[in-house]
A protein has these predicted regions:
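DNA major-groove recognition helix of helix-turn-helix
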Residues: 30, 54-61, 65
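Short, Lys/Arg-enriched N-terminal segment that forms or immediately precedes the first helix
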Residues: 2-14
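Short, basic interhelical loop/turn and adjoining N-cap
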Residues: 41-55
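Long, charge-rich, low-complexity intrinsically disordered regions
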Residues: 1-2, 109
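Short Lys/Arg-enriched helix C-cap and helix-to-coil transition segments
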Residues: 61-79
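Amphipathic alpha-helical protein-protein interaction segments
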Residues: 74-109
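Short, amphipathic alpha-helical "recognition" segments used to contact nucleic acids or chromatin
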Residues: 15-34
Length: 109
């Protein structure tokens, strides 16, 4: 913005992130196990956008924002499971029951 004396003034609004940037931010924050509402706040979603995002995460398999959220959480779930399996294979008495539960989950499919 330029004032009447042609000097620049700072913009009062920040540029909004691109759709890809927003999806990446959501995925990264979800991977850090942030709540849906916290992610909405950190990405400057309006209250209406927040409600839509919360609804999408709970009810939509096709919404790109919901997919990014689920994908981020699943990456963390994968990392945690890998650690548990690694510790179980090394004889950890705390990790072995968890690894057994993971095996039972997969038998149901």
């Amino acid at each position: 913005m330029i004032t009447s004396d042609n000097s620049p003034t700072p913009s009062t609004t920040l540029p909004s992130p691109s759709a890809d940037d927003l999806l990446t931010q959501i995925e990264e924050m979800a991977a850090a196990l942030m709540t849906v509402r916290d992610i909405a706040l950190l990405t400057d979603m309006s209250s209406e956008e927040t409600d839509t995002f919360v609804y999408a995460v709970k009810n939509s398999l096709d919404n790109p924002l919901a997919k990014a959220y689920r994908k981020g959480r699943l990456w963390t779930k994968l990392a945690l499971r890998r650690k548990v399996v690694d510790f179980a294979l090394k004889g950890s008495p705390a990790a072995q029951p968890l690894a057994d539960e993971y095996l039972k989950e997969n038998e149901l499919l």
